[in-house]
Amino acid sequence: TSSSQMETDISGSFRSGIDLKGRITSQPIGAWKQVQGSGIARGAHVLIGNKSCVIAVGDSGYSPAPAAVASISTEIYDGQTWYAHANLPLSFRCGEGAGDVHSELLFGGEMSGSHVPYIAGIKNGTLRGDGTSFSQDAYMNTAQADGPAVKGGNVGTQNSALSVQLSYPSPGLVTTEEYDGMTWKLHPKQPMVAAGNESTGTVTAAIVVGGHGKGACTEFFDGTSWASGPTPPRQKCGGAMGGTQNDAMTIGGASNSPFYRESELFDGTSWTSTNQS
């Protein structure tokens, strides 16, 4: 078929019209909807996966359920309902996680001044899940409460993870650690020392945003060193984040301020607020 004949055929198809059946409807873009609640109301827990298959792990001690139950429990959401999953071998409070459902990596835990006792071996320990059970693995280098894994940012997979910062900064604890599936190693300190931050991406292409007293910062990590980026409009701390270094979304924050209902989008160059919640 010649190019001129193909052009004639295509234009003729459009002139003849398109046959549509049924009502034409529209759906709001960027809207939130409520789904079934989990069995345990959790606080400061780990969430891994996506909206069709996600696992919730541990609790900070705020759950109405007994601490001995909530802090070792896990639940899986299959896109429609929540159901109980395997228990952890140790209580897991205020830690962080990476990986995916059935290949979970959980690390760190316990904030200083917490109203629940520290659990030896977990505030700088690592737990791995395989879909059937959880087992303990390597220890992180910073072995103190409020270490880099306590409510900081984290990215990666079960065998390649990055733990960034901590809950509240202290000179001896401002570290970034990388896990290679067997051991943890220290990385250069984050320049802005943004504790309680949010982060996403990969071990060699991470983005870290906000933090207590440093909500205005955006920082990039390339696997070796840090670089600063543009200031986000809302300057949040204690939020959550998803996406990649060049296509990220952040939401929430450390208080109930109205603007914490907004989402912020990053395209690799600049930030925009959506005012969708």
Please give the residue ranges for each predicted region.
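Polar, enzyme-active/binding microenvironments
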Residues: T1-S277
